[in-house]
Regions:
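Short aromatic/hydrophobic contact patches that present stacked aromatics
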Residues: 2, 74-78, 109-111, 150-152
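A short beta-loop-alpha structural element at the N-terminal edge
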Residues: 1-14
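Hydrophobic pocket/interface hotspot
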Residues: 14, 18, 39
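Acetyl-CoA-dependent GNAT
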Residues: 8, 24-84, 93-94, 99, ...
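Conserved catalytic-core motifs of GNAT/GCN5-like acyltransferases
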Residues: 67, 109-113, 124, 129-146
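Glycine-rich phosphate-binding loop
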Residues: 87
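Conserved beta-strand edge residues that scaffold enzyme active sites
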Residues: 35, 57, 114-115, 137-138
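Conserved GNAT acetyl-CoA-binding A-motif
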Residues: 100-112
């Protein structure tokens, strides 16, 4: 299992992972599927860093950070839920830390909807600490409002 920088060749596989997660519902604030063009713009152009984890030539997940204010990064992480690979998230985060630290900055923020139990557990396991709660910050397609939990990882 290796983590490396995302390339344009990875976009179809990563878009499929994202869109499958969106279709399952309840584990991301992303509610609408993305086209490959939208995904490439967001992850290859707007993201400061974006990596993939590859297992036997197959993309098993991706992770990136975007600017979130002075000295802060906002993280987004997705792993393939059709064929999960244990440890993929940890390998991605180790690579991301190695890429972020030389850039400087104070912290990485993870902004997770309160109904995303898996995401909350993942970021806690990676060492993120609870930082803020944004009440009723996100509305699900069925009209339910959920809090956003902000977790912080100091760099």
């Amino acid at each position: 299992m290796i983590a490396r920088a995302m390339t344009k060749e990875d976009v179809p596989a990563c878009t499929a992972i994202l869109n499958h997660t969106v279709a399952l519902g309840g584990s991301t604030a992303q509610e609408e599927p993305m086209t490959e063009e939208e995904f490439a713009q967001d992850h290859l152009v707007e993201a400061l860093i974006c990596n993939v984890v590859e297992v036997d030539g197959r993309i098993a997940g991706f992770q990136g950070v975007w600017p979130a204010g002075e000295g802060l990064y906002s993280i987004g992480s997705f792993t393939d839920r059709r064929e999960p690979v244990p440890g993929a998230g940890r390998v991605l985060f180790e690579k991301l830390l190695n890429d972020c630290r030389p850039r400087g900055g104070e912290a990485i923020l993870a902004k997770i909807t309160s109904d995303n139990i898996g995401g909350l557990a993942y970021y806690s396991k990676m060492g993120f600490a609870d930082f803020e709660i944004w009440p009723d910050d996100h509305q699900r397609p069925d009209g339910r409002k959920v809090d956003r939990i902000v977790k912080r990882f100091p760099l």
